[in-house]
């Protein structure tokens, strides 16, 4: 099956690109099949060979050594060495006799001429035999060796000629010997100078990569045109001719580079003059063709093109044009410079392979930029030269901030008008206005959203802004006596709740309004759903009203500690009508802070209301309040999915009850063990501890399918500060053991994950996420650990019952989220339910987390700037340059240390949200 897949991949690649090096591609495919067929081999290593195959399919030049592959993507030192060893024993299928360069034909031509000169000397039979042997070996030798051998052959032939002339004569005198030496030296100098001139001119040879259409500029004032109706001349090539070019003739034949001198088809009688000078440096490589040209342009071509126009015919209509591959023309910039003689592509300077053409007509105008075509190559680190007609890249357009995008941000005028029509449901009684797109609405449950600035470990980057900004625009609250400039963000039109927020300075300025009315208030909040007084005061749908009547799930959204929404240094503002049904004490006046809700005189639960009425007892001398509550029991709640086996589903609960622990089995949306404290009125108070139990095999499977990462994230955002990850099974002992066979056997049982991989995951969880890792050997050890924790809670929370209650802050740290607010088990399940109604920003954040390399902190940073997928799409769509778009998120920061995203994640996000298939 693997061979068939490789064959299909190769055929698909060959359909798009004709591979010039099929033997190397075949060799790499064999390497891939060998790796796949090898037992225990790492299949990921085949990606290197596949990348090399893609580069070879795009590379337009033949490869004759492994060193030439160094410039290609996917070829490292080891792979280059393998290919080099392979090419030593395998010839190129298209060029079996070596590289097809023009220099080879020139060297063969010179060697053949030397053979002809040596054959004329009848007395040098031995030298002729040596020369023939050398010429036969020159096909496999390098060009430098050919030059040296030809030079040695010429010197030996001259010496033998001089010696043969002296045979039969008397012994030469000293003067004659000196004369012979001088002649030999002069001949050597002439030969060396001729060879140097030949090499210098050969280095200037241009060998263009063949393309579909080749156009040449001959330096004329007006270029040749293919239109017969035009008065200008035309020139056409026999290669890749089109139907329009069938009536034009341009005959030439480069011949085979392996057969010596190329053959030229000259149709004119004057071509014989060229054949006499076949050994010259320029005329030997010229190609003669006949073109039609207008009389008005004859003189112009004769003056400007001395190297091309050979002579005029008698009729004056035809001109013989000689084309040479040697660089003897003036206007050679339009041709693409090819590799010089026998140089590896790794040593070549990068060049731009840009061909400019306009359909079938060649255009020489500088304004014709739309017809430029850029041919990409698989070379590494391409540096393109600058041409007048090069591709013009549009400047990078930085994405505007969300506050500047008119598509989804609208600002009110500065004329102190009220908020205009906003599509907010009138059924919701709590209404608010946002000061900026960066302030999010609190959520309806007792804990804010995981993606709100208050719940992330990273403190909000906008904290200092609210502290220092005392301008009227920072205020969002609206009193009846004063108005402020409000900003409406249409991205949050679907938010369920809104808050009236006022800066800390404005609260101090408005303290006098509260002193005249709030002297006898007692600071208690009534959350009963049947409070008629509050409901009667909120019949008006005015935007300034603040309704405190809400369900138990929505109560006390803004009463948070340093990690909550109040951390943004803003305070809630109420009007007299809003506070008509509640008691307000003196803490607002003295401290200008929202008091903490503290349970006091809690009535027993009734059928009509499951929530409790809480109040605070404060005094002028004490800013901090103490809790007066008595707990009578601690209950351990076990998830109904935590069982020992199918037959013993209640094993854990029964064992805990036998040990004197009040344990119950209930459904938990998150976690496996939680604790609830029962007060004297039988009200439940969720404690600030949660345990997630994992067997070793379950941990391995959760890491593979991704549940491990998701559960850690949900646990960190559950509201519980003390998260315990309990691993049931032997992990540490297996890791520390020296037996490799034991590790291998252990890993096969646990989804092929080694103990080292599991240990790495646990250490990362403990250090990065701050989660407590606890290991137990068996389920009985797990039960012992649960018993010890429960006894600890009893000691801390029930020890002061006989002394009349108390505890203060010592009790608060054991309550859910370190708050003095009651949270029941039902509220906890609603808060952490997977199927709860997510807001758009939460749904968008969970979508971003699924992207490889995008963590929760990175998703939070993105949603701070782009709160909706549409805002992100519009911002990326405004970036026209792909390179700048792929690096758009590169400089985004995340985490406490303000680390950068990097290029890889930025490219993935850009390509995902700009992909047409994804948008459809």
From Swiss-Prot:
SUPFAM superfamilies: DNA polymerase beta, N-terminal domain-like, Restriction endonuclease-like. Residues 635-731 form the ERCC4 domain. CDD domains: XPF_nuclease_Mus81. Residues 108-142, 152-165, 265-282, 351-372, 471-490, 505-539, 607-620 have a biased composition (Low complexity). Residues 166-178 have a biased composition (Polar residues). It is an enzyme of class 3 (hydrolase). The gene is mus81. The keyword Methyltransferase does not apply. Residues 540-556 have a biased composition (Acidic residues). Interacts with eme1. GO terms for biological process: DNA catabolic process; double-strand break repair via break-induced replication; mitotic intra-S DNA damage checkpoint signaling; resolution of meiotic recombination intermediates. It is found in: Nucleus. Residues 457-467 have a biased composition (Basic residues). This is Probable crossover junction endonuclease mus81. Belongs to the XPF family. Component of a DNA structure-specific endonuclease with substrate preference for branched DNA structures with a 5'-end at the branch nick. May be required in mitosis for the processing of stalled or collapsed replication fork intermediates. May be required in meiosis for the repair of meiosis-specific double strand breaks subsequent to single-end invasion (SEI). It comes from the Eukaryota. Residues 90-190, 265-297, 335-376, 457-490, 505-560, 595-621 are annotated as: Disordered. Its EC number is 3.1.22.-. GO terms for molecular function: 3'-flap endonuclease activity; crossover junction DNA endonuclease activity; DNA binding; metal ion binding. InterPro entries: DNA_pol_lamdba_lyase_dom_sf, EME1/EME2_C, ERCC4_domain, Mus81, Restrct_endonuc-II-like, XPF_nuclease_Mus81. One of its GO terms (cellular component) is Holliday junction resolvase complex. Its cofactor is Mg(2+). The keyword Manganese applies. Keywords: DNA damage, DNA recombination, DNA repair, Endonuclease, Hydrolase, Magnesium, Manganese, Metal-binding, Nuclease, Nucleus.
């Amino acid at each position: 099956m693997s061979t068939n897949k490789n064959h299909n991949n190769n055929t698909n690649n060959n359909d798009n690109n004709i591979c010039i090096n099929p033997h190397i591609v075949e060799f790499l495919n064999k390497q891939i099949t060998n790796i796949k067929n090898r037992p225990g081999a790492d299949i990921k290593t085949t990606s290197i060979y596949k990348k090399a195959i893609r580069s070879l399919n795009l590379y337009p030049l033949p490869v004759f050594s492994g060193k030439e592959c160094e410039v290609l993507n996917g070829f490292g030192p080891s792979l280059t060495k393998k290919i080099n060893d392979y090419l030593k024993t395998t010839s190129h299928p298209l060029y079996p006799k070596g590289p097809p360069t023009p220099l080879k034909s020139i060297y063969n031509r010179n060697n053949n001429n030397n053979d002809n000169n040596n054959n004329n000397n009848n007395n040098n039979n031995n030298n002729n035999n040596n020369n023939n042997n050398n010429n036969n070996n020159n096909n496999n030798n390098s060009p430098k060796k050919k030059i040296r051998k030809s030079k040695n052959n010429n010197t030996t032939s001259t010496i033998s000629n001089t010696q043969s002339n002296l045979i039969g004569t008397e012994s030469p005198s000293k003067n004659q010997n000196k004369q012979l030496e001088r002649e030999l030296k002069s001949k050597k100098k002439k030969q060396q100078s001729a060879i140097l001139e030949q090499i210098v001119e050969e280095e200037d040879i241009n060998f263009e990569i063949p393309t579909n259409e080749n156009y040449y500029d001959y330096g004329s004032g007006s270029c040749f045109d293919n239109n017969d109706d035009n008065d200008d001349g035309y020139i056409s090539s026999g290669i890749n001719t089109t139907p329009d070019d069938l009536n034009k003739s341009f005959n030439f034949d480069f011949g085979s580079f392996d057969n010596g001198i190329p053959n030229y088809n000259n149709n004119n009688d004057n071509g014989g003059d060229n054949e006499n000078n076949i050994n010259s440096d320029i005329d030997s490589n010229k190609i003669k063709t006949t073109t039609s040209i207008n009389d008005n342009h004859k003189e112009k071509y004769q003056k400007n093109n001395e190297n091309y126009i050979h002579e005029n015919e008698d009729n004056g209509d035809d001109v013989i044009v000689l084309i040479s591959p040697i660089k003897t023309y003036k206007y050679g910039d339009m041709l693409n410079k090819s590799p010089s003689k026998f140089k590896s592509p790794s040593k070549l300077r990068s060049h731009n392979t840009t061909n400019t053409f306009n359909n079938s007509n060649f255009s020489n105008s500088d304004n014709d930029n739309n017809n430029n075509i850029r041919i990409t190559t698989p070379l590494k680190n391409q540096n393109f030269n600058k041409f007048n007609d090069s591709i013009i890249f549009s400047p990078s357009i930085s994405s505007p901030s969300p506050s500047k995008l008119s598509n989804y941000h609208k600002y009110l005028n500065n004329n102190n008008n009220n908020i205009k029509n906003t599509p907010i449901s009138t059924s919701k009684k709590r209404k608010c206005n946002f000061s900026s797109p960066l302030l999010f609405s609190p959520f309806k449950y007792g804990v804010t959203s995981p993606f709100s600035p208050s719940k992330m470990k990273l403190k909000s980057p906008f904290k200092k802004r609210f502290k220092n900004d005392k301008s009227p625009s920072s205020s969002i609250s609206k009193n009846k006596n004063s108005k402020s400039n409000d900003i409406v963000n249409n991205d949050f039109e679907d938010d369920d709740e809104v808050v009236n927020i006022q800066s800390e300075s404005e609260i101090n300025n408005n303290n006098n309004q509260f002193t005249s009315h709030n002297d006898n208030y007692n600071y208690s909040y009534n959350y009963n759903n049947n409070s008629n007084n509050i409901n009667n005061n909120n019949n008006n749908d005015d935007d300034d009203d603040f309704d405190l009547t809400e369900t138990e799930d929505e109560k006390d959204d803004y009463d948070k500690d340093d990690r909550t929404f109040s951390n943004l240094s803003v305070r809630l503002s109420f009007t007299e009508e809003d506070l008509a049904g509640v008691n307000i004490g003196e803490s607002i006046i003295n401290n200008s802070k929202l008091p903490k809700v503290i349970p006091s005189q809690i009535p027993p639960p009734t059928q009509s209301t499951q929530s409790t009425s809480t109040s605070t007892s404060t005094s002028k001398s004490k800013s901090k309040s103490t809790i007066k509550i008595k707990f009578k029991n601690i209950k351990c709640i076990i998830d109904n999915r935590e069982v020992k086996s199918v037959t013993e589903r209640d094993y854990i609960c029964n064992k805990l009850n036998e040990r004197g622990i009040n344990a119950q089995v209930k459904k938990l949306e998150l976690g496996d063990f939680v604790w609830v404290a029962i007060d004297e009125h039988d009200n439940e108070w969720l404690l600030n501890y949660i345990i997630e139990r994992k067997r070793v095999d379950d941990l391995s499977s959760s890491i593979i399918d991704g549940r491990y990462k998701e559960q850690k994230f949900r646990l960190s955002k559950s509201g519980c500060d003390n998260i315990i990850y309990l691993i049931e099974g032997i992990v540490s002992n297996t890791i520390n053991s020296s037996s490799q066979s034991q590790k291998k056997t252990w890993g096969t049982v646990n989804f092929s994950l080694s103990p080292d991989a599991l240990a790495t995951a646990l250490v990362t969880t403990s250090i990065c996420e701050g989660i407590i890792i606890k290991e137990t050997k068996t389920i009985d050890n797990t039960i012992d650990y649960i018993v010890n924790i429960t006894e600890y809670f009893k000691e801390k929370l029930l020890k002061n019952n006989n002394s009349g209650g108390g505890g203060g802050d010592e009790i608060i740290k054991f309550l859910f989220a370190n708050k003095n607010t009651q949270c029941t088990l039902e509220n906890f399940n609603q808060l952490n339910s997977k199927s709860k109604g997510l807001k758009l920003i939460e749904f968008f954040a969970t979508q971003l987390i699924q992207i490889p390399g995008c963590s929760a902190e990175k998703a939070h940073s993105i949603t701070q700037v782009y709160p909706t997928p549409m805002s992100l799409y519009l911002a990326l769509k405004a970036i026209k340059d792909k390179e700048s778009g792929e690096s758009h998120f590169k400089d985004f920061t995340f985490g406490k240390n303000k680390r950068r995203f990097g290029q890889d994640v930025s490219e993935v996000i850009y390509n995902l949200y700009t992909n047409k298939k994804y948008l459809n």
